[in-house]
Amino acid sequence: MVKQNDKIILAYSGGLDTSVAISWLKDKGYDVVACGIDVGEGKDMDAIKEKALKLGAVSSYMIDAKQEFAEEYALIALQGHTLYEGEYPLVSALSRPLIAKKLVTLAKQEHAVAIAHGCTGKGNDQVRFEVAIHALAPDIKIEAPVRDWHWSREEEIDYAKEHNIPVPINLDSPYSIDENLWGRANECGILEDPWQGAPADAFDRTKALADTPDTPTTLEITFEAGVPVALDGESLNLADLIIKLDQIAGEHGIGRIDHIENRLVGIKSREVYEAPAATVLLKAHKDLEDLTFERELAHFKPIIEQKLADTIYNGLWFSPLMEAMVAFLKQTQQVVNGVVRVQLFKGNVITEGRKSPNSLYDTNLATYTSADSFDQQAAVGFIKLWGLPTQVNAQVQAKAQAEAKTDKAHA
């Protein structure tokens, strides 16, 4: 039961759903506090703030979280090489725990009794938001207006008109889009048919290959302890580096992903993603790890990477397992220092060179020239011992087969 002056924090985007949610929550008796979190969507946050107030929110907060998103969320995805099902760079999944954290912080500040989000009952985000919120504030109430009101799109528009809520002029767009610094996610409309190719208007951050430059761009990316810190020698904070690289790579058509995805809620969904900067950084970072990791670590880390991707996708950011995996990641990154040179061309990221003060590549051991320092005679004993279990097994099996033939002949 909602009491008079009970506050609720609404994750507010400025779109139709959360705009209608302000009125709907007010009808339930709440004082609505709108909260927009900027993780790099490129929206006019001041306009969104004013819109919330005009629609009846008692207060409206806009939080710039781009740098925090880059340094504490996207960076983990980069260092963990997280690709859900080997394809999806966790664009939306990465922002949800940060948004949830900001909502909970504001709820405590405003002494709110509840938090509301604008997710439907069909997607993954409802799970991510609610699990994250209750991990940080176990006893707070959660409202999900869009999931609860059971309206068709037409009924929602009728409600908006009755309550003088502006209907966006792009409402006829068939797509559902979410984006942040790390990439852009697109679904619905013609994309729901997995046989149909994604049309040109489904993309925004990448050029079609036919429209990309006919000459490649070469970049040098500098890493310190696994963190990208410079492009072509220009030092940049991580958020700015991602933004700049996103524009450069997008011009070359890099980072388009068309993926049939197994959602957490049990259905398959066709998703179209654009992640130009993420695609380049993931490639460059992996190449630098290949240069600096010893073999056992290089072979083990992908096991953690897959579990990390699943954990983030499934909304378990604030969990003991996640904390342990992040600690593992941070430990591994101490040697990931150096520069990677990549060529961007016609949708491809090609590594041309890499160097590191922590490189484990020894030219004198690897070369086949007269400078070779590898003791090839040591291979004789190594092969004998390495192959001994296989050799012994073969001898035992051969003996057993011979005895079986003898027994059969005497039977």
Curated annotation (Swiss-Prot):
GO terms for cellular component: cytoplasm. The keyword Transcription does not apply. Pathway: Amino-acid biosynthesis; L-arginine biosynthesis; L-arginine from L-ornithine and carbamoyl phosphate: step 2/3. GO terms for biological process: argininosuccinate metabolic process; L-arginine biosynthetic process; urea cycle. It comes from the Bacteria. L-citrulline binds at Y88, N124, R128, S176, E261, Y273. Transmembrane segments: none annotated. Its EC number is 6.3.4.5. GO terms for molecular function: argininosuccinate synthase activity; ATP binding. It catalyses: L-citrulline + L-aspartate + ATP = 2-(N(omega)-L-arginino)succinate + AMP + diphosphate + H(+). CDD domains: ASS (cd01999). L-aspartate binds at T120, N124, D125. Pfam families: Arginosuc_syn_C (PF20979), Arginosuc_synth (PF00764). Its main location: cytoplasm. It is found in: Cytoplasm. Homotetramer. Belongs to the argininosuccinate synthase family. Type 1 subfamily. This is Argininosuccinate synthase. It comes from Lactiplantibacillus plantarum (strain ATCC BAA-793 / NCIMB 8826 / WCFS1) (Lactobacillus plantarum). The lineage of its organism: Bacteria, Bacillati, Bacillota, Bacilli, Lactobacillales.
